[in-house]
Amino acid sequence: MISKSKTAAPDIDKLTKPKAKVELMRLRLAIEGHDKAYYQDDAPKIPDADYDALRRRLEAIEAKFPELLSASSPSQTVGAAPARGFSKVQHAVPMLSLGNAFSDDEVGEFVERVQRFLKLEDIPAIVAEPKIDGLSLSLRYENGTLVRAATRGDGFTGEDVTANVRTIADIPTTLKAKTIPAACELRGEVYMLKHDFLALNKRQEEAGDTVFANPRNSAAGSLRQKDVAITASRPLKFFAYAWGEMSDYPMESPTQHAMLAWLGDAGFTVNPEITLCHSVDDALAFYRRIGEQRAALPYDIDGVVYKVDRLDYQARLGFVSRSPRWAIAHKFAAEQAVTVLEKIDIQVGRTGALTPVARLQPVTVGGVVVQNATLHNEDYIKGVGSDGSPLRDGVDIREGDTVVVQRAGDVIPQIVTVVLDKRPADLPAYKFPHKCPVCGSHAAREEGEAVWRCTGALICPAQAVERLKHFVSRLAFDIDGLGEKQIVLFHERGWVREPADIFTLKARNAELKLEDLEGYGETSVRNLFAAIDARRNIELNRLIFALGIRHVGEGNAKLLARHYGSIDVFLAAMRAAAEGQTPEGNTSEAYQDLDNIAGIGDVVAEAVVEFFAEPRNVGALDALLREIEVLPVEQAKQDTAVAGKTVVFTGALTKFTRDEAKAAAERLGAKVAGSVSKKTDYVVAGEDAGSKLTKARDLGVAVLTEDEWLALIG
């Protein structure tokens, strides 16, 4: 594959509908991934500003092409789905996110929109609140007693953390106010004081446990513990500032400000900095004052939230898809400091991604000592943003530069500016490595991507464990008794470094002595070796899938296997295609044949050729092939009753396994799909068939029992 410079993202006005559709798909996937990292994993991967830029471009494209708007788009949803491990809780009133303002003008525009919507001549009273950087929480009280606590989750469904919340001293188990609704959902933010965070991290480090990146992550991670005792040991705090369902309000003509006072009477801690403003100037003055005090505050804030004070106005204003019209968040710029970038190191992730990391002269940013900063990728170093537009006015980053570092969103240290006046005249530009620093294999960058990846999939130590886990997975070699746990153990001991090593374990066991391992004995070792031997004969599609080539899943592996038919033909074609690679592209007949396979295309074809262009991969595969036999593909029949038909299997099958049914259908020339559509020809329904059966009936698709299917295929 040829490395190509990332081109600037096209102006939205110039986007065609097909290109807009592709970019929306890319943006939605990126945002969903970052939402999961933030809301589920408590480990954000990019700065708030970069995330906000992705969202703004998504929303702008959707505004131009409203017909491409999807109900599942991040612009229409909030947060991320609840993580596994906690019971799910449905919020009676959704916990939506807030729209953002990034300038004084945008705050003024927010107030003007409110006035126009309500047809007011005067500016309505606005409550200004510090935006606490923590974890949103909803508390349900019935007859004044706490009955349930839930995280925000995706805004509609959260995680039940009631037991953990009962350990937080700031949260009353019984409301104390004179007037208490029969049922109410009270909301706020779980957070950790800065000095408590530093003390916790010190204890974690001394104990050899994970240290947290910032107070927000520590608060979220502490609350979402399966062991309540761990949560109880953590110094969590809570500010109350909102509510959801209320069976009745505890006052006549309620306002935001009055409700906050009631929350204080009920036993909650309410932020003492909250201020009632009567003009845009008042609101902006509060923003600047609290911003100046930010470093001295005992807790982290990342902005100010403005809310219309009168609740009847809030009710009239209502909501847009994912945020209220009556509130907006005014974000702070990140805290910054100046230091020297001493070195750029390259880290290799488990998927082979080469990620540059800046090693800095230690500097304090926002009260935290920073020594490293993310550089994201080659484009970021060169001064090119994630959307192709210039970063830092297009100025690149070099080893030895004096740089401005910020903790973006008080989370991830990031280089935002280079001080060019201090750059030595002879300082060379940084050259991103085109070889993996771990294994020496060449690195490749796909067109349209910013990431360079190591192509030494089978031999790179940085990727080895994940690749080996994939190699023995169910759809690959599927070796009984050799799962993830065993792979990790054998790799740590140096016994299995590449796939061929699995098949030489038996021959080496006189030296290794697997039977001496804890949990093993002569019988279990004998059974393991028998299971390995049983997989010395493998179907071509399973082998191709097992190689872990990027973009080659189960379906593409089958397409390749059917096209080439045998391992010898496949290898000869791949070697010829790899030899045809040139800086100008690949015009070899072998590559064109690969690229023209129905369902493959450029992206998959280039990934396959990159794999075989790396000699170390070929060497590892040759070593594997000396230990196994690859079975030729049984060509699908074309003269059967189901040849060319699309079939979906659903429900519990009793006469064959799902894999057996799928394989039999494919041998007879049918295409097996995972979902029902108008293009589906048959749905084979077993016991307890659910939504797929219902959809098939709604669409008029032919539904067969197992017996009817067997009769059809003879």
Swiss-Prot record:
<keyword id="KW-0234">DNA repair</keyword>
<dbReference type="Pfam" id="PF01653">
    <property type="entry name" value="DNA_ligase_aden"/>
</dbReference>
<dbReference type="InterPro" id="IPR033136">
    <property type="entry name" value="DNA_ligase_CS"/>
</dbReference>
<keyword id="KW-0436">Ligase</keyword>
<keyword id="KW-0479">Metal-binding</keyword>
<keyword id="KW-0227">DNA damage</keyword>
<feature type="binding site">
    <location>
        <begin position="48"/>
        <end position="52"/>
    </location>
    <ligand>
        <name>NAD(+)</name>
    </ligand>
</feature>
<dbReference type="InterPro" id="IPR013839">
    <property type="entry name" value="DNAligase_adenylation"/>
</dbReference>
<feature type="binding site">
    <location>
        <position position="307"/>
    </location>
    <ligand>
        <name>NAD(+)</name>
    </ligand>
</feature>
<feature type="domain" description="BRCT">
    <location>
        <begin position="637"/>
        <end position="714"/>
    </location>
</feature>
<dbReference type="GO" id="GO:0046872">
    <property type="term" value="F:metal ion binding"/>
</dbReference>
<keyword id="KW-0520">NAD</keyword>
<keyword id="KW-0464">Manganese</keyword>
<dbReference type="InterPro" id="IPR004149">
    <property type="entry name" value="Znf_DNAligase_C4"/>
</dbReference>
<feature type="binding site">
    <location>
        <position position="331"/>
    </location>
    <ligand>
        <name>NAD(+)</name>
    </ligand>
</feature>
<dbReference type="Pfam" id="PF12826">
    <property type="entry name" value="HHH_2"/>
</dbReference>
<dbReference type="GO" id="GO:0003911">
    <property type="term" value="F:DNA ligase (NAD+) activity"/>
</dbReference>
<dbReference type="GO" id="GO:0006281">
    <property type="term" value="P:DNA repair"/>
</dbReference>
<dbReference type="Pfam" id="PF00533">
    <property type="entry name" value="BRCT"/>
</dbReference>
<comment type="function">
    <text>DNA ligase that catalyzes the formation of phosphodiester linkages between 5'-phosphoryl and 3'-hydroxyl groups in double-stranded DNA using NAD as a coenzyme and as the energy source for the reaction. It is essential for DNA replication and repair of damaged DNA.</text>
</comment>
<feature type="binding site">
    <location>
        <position position="436"/>
    </location>
    <ligand>
        <name>Zn(2+)</name>
    </ligand>
</feature>
<dbReference type="InterPro" id="IPR013840">
    <property type="entry name" value="DNAligase_N"/>
</dbReference>
<dbReference type="InterPro" id="IPR012340">
    <property type="entry name" value="NA-bd_OB-fold"/>
</dbReference>
<dbReference type="InterPro" id="IPR041663">
    <property type="entry name" value="DisA/LigA_HHH"/>
</dbReference>
<dbReference type="GO" id="GO:0006260">
    <property type="term" value="P:DNA replication"/>
</dbReference>
<keyword id="KW-0460">Magnesium</keyword>
<dbReference type="GO" id="GO:0005829">
    <property type="term" value="C:cytosol"/>
</dbReference>
<feature type="binding site">
    <location>
        <position position="152"/>
    </location>
    <ligand>
        <name>NAD(+)</name>
    </ligand>
</feature>
<dbReference type="InterPro" id="IPR004150">
    <property type="entry name" value="NAD_DNA_ligase_OB"/>
</dbReference>
<dbReference type="InterPro" id="IPR018239">
    <property type="entry name" value="DNA_ligase_AS"/>
</dbReference>
<dbReference type="InterPro" id="IPR036420">
    <property type="entry name" value="BRCT_dom_sf"/>
</dbReference>
<dbReference type="InterPro" id="IPR001357">
    <property type="entry name" value="BRCT_dom"/>
</dbReference>
<feature type="binding site">
    <location>
        <begin position="97"/>
        <end position="98"/>
    </location>
    <ligand>
        <name>NAD(+)</name>
    </ligand>
</feature>
<feature type="binding site">
    <location>
        <position position="460"/>
    </location>
    <ligand>
        <name>Zn(2+)</name>
    </ligand>
</feature>
<comment type="similarity">
    <text>Belongs to the NAD-dependent DNA ligase family. LigA subfamily.</text>
</comment>
<dbReference type="InterPro" id="IPR001679">
    <property type="entry name" value="DNA_ligase"/>
</dbReference>
<keyword id="KW-0862">Zinc</keyword>
<dbReference type="Pfam" id="PF03120">
    <property type="entry name" value="DNA_ligase_OB"/>
</dbReference>
<feature type="binding site">
    <location>
        <position position="189"/>
    </location>
    <ligand>
        <name>NAD(+)</name>
    </ligand>
</feature>
<protein>
    <recommendedName>
        <fullName>DNA ligase</fullName>
        <ecNumber>6.5.1.2</ecNumber>
    </recommendedName>
</protein>
<feature type="active site" description="N6-AMP-lysine intermediate">
    <location>
        <position position="131"/>
    </location>
</feature>
<keyword id="KW-0235">DNA replication</keyword>
